[in-house]
A protein has these predicted regions:
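A domain-start/cap signature at the N-terminus of enzymes
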Residues: 23-26, 31-44, 87, 94-154, ...
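Primarily recognizes the serine-hydrolase "nucleophile elbow" in alpha/beta-hydrolase
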Residues: 227-276
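The feature captures the conserved acid-bearing segment of alpha/beta-hydrolase catalytic domains
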Residues: 261-330
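Catalytic active-site module of serine/aspartate enzymes centered on a nucleophile-bearing elbow/loop
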Residues: 327-343
Length: 343
């Protein structure tokens, strides 16, 4: 009997060792490897295990504290522990980060929204956003066309990033053969803070100030054909592009926007004035974008009032770039610049 207990103890020790060894296999050589494994845990709804993993790597990946504490809070929330979810966000603050303006807008955060502790967290987070706003400024990056010759004049494309993005995030996606080959493209980064690494265009007065300053700087430094300027952008950048083009913040020939938030301040008189200036535009969107109906309504108003505008909807995709975006962008440039020559 004693021997049986000894054997059982050895077996249990062996099992425990095997379990520990199994856990030790999850040593990650990079943040990417960890995120891939974390994604599997979330997809399998192993939220407690995901939370334990995230807690264990907070010190290992100090450059990713923002994402890791946010995902830790999500894991705790999905596991049904609201207090630990808030504690994870407070840990992010303790480690020096703050969260984005829209990070807690989704309904999944409803379980914590009535908590006084969460309200205190949000107040502190807003204070950090406001402090970051004091240091923020508009920035630009310029891409000149292939075989650029400063003695020639080139069409200009003013490109505006999406909400919560930076130029670094946006620039690789917003490009096309015509932009690379023919245009001076200025990527403008808003001064309006959305998150630690991202910005937005929702304040119309600030958007106007930023864009007018960027446009002035470009004209001073580059040979722009001011009669062939186009503005465009994604999501919040689409919002900024629409108000800038239709309300005549900048003297552009047209706009190209992808999945934009639709400005509510654009009146029929603005559209008629834009028509008189011979403005043209293209609105690209996707079937699962949550603003499709507002986008359709705006385009319907433009059509009714006689402003030439093209509408294109890509099926089976959400709020993001369609696979043929570059071709769609070049087609839109043709619609604005070439078709407008005969008017």
């Amino acid at each position: 009997m004693k021997r049986a207990f000894v054997i059982l103890g050895i077996v249990l020790c062996s099992l425990s060792l095997a379990m520990l060894q199994g856990q030790e296999k999850h040593e990650f050589g990079s943040y990417k490897e960890m995120r891939e494994y974390l994604g599997k845990l979330f997809s399998q709804k192993k939220y407690d295990e995901a939370a334990s993993l995230l807690e264990s790597v907070l010190d290992k990946f100090p450059d990713n504290v923002l994402a890791n504490t946010y995902n830790l809070a999500l894991a705790r929330l999905f596991a049904g522990d609201s207090e630990k979810a808030i504690r994870a966000l407070e840990e992010g603050h303790r480690r020096g980060v703050f969260y984005g303006l829209w990070d807690f807008a989704a309904k999944l955060w409803d379980p914590v929204k009535s908590s006084t502790r969460f309200e205190a967290f949000l107040k502190e987070n807003q204070a950090r956003v406001e402090e970051a706003q004091k240091r923020a400024s508009m920035k630009i990056e310029v891409a000149t066309p292939a075989e650029y010759d400063p003695a020639k004049k080139y069409p200009l494309f003013i490109a505006l990033h999406g909400g919560g993005e930076s130029v670094a995030d946006f620039k690789p996606s917003w490009t096309s053969p015509r932009l690379r080959g023919e245009f001076i493209t200025v990527y403008v980064q808003s001064s309006q803070v959305a998150s630690m690494r991202g910005f937005h265009w929702q304040d119309v007065a600030v958007t106007r100030r930023d864009l007018e300053a960027a446009y002035k700087r470009i004209l001073e430094q580059f040979p722009v054909d001011t009669g062939r300027a186009v503005i465009g952008g994604f999501s919040s950048g689409g919002f900024g592009s629409l108000v800038a083009a239709i309300k005549n913040f900048l003297p552009v020939r047209g706009f190209v926007v992808l999945c934009p938030e639709v400005p509510t301040t654009i009146g029929d008189e603005d559209i008629l004035a834009a028509k008189a200036r011979r403005l043209r535009g293209t609105l690209l969107t996707t079937e699962a974008d949550n603003r499709v109906e507002q986008q359709r309504t705006l385009m319907g108003r433009m059509e009714k009032l006689g402003l030439p505008a093209d509408f294109h909807l890509t099926p089976d995709i959400g709020h993001w770039y369609p696979k043929d975006f570059e071709a769609l962008l070049d087609r839109a440039l043709g619609f604005i610049l070439e078709a407008g020559k005969s008017e």
